[in-house]
Amino acid sequence: VVERETAFTSACEKAPLSIPAKHSWGRYYADEQTLATMRANGQVVLRYAAGENFNGSVDDIAGVRNEQGNVFGLMPHPEHAVDELTGSADGLCIFASMRLAVEGHHSLTPPDGGQAGARV
């Protein structure tokens, strides 16, 4: 978890998270200027742990959000990590974070009001 102050990760206290990725061809790509803008705006939310970037995602990016903070795109599948019986319950923190945001306990808008940066 790169950014915890989001509507999607505010309840994620553990790091790293163990969440399965179930893709073989998908990977994140953006040019260097876009990446720099996204990093500066806190839009890179998740990165693969060291040695876990099996698909060549640029900058080890596993999840991003748009500049308004209300859209989250990610490669891992948190819905497949909700019960220890299946290997991990680490995905629950993502769903708990969204619940907190919907209930009004966390803002959906980034600190800059979503005014700066590139669209993702």
Segments and roles (model prediction):
Residues 1-120:
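Amide-donor transfer/coupling interface in amidating biosynthetic enzymes
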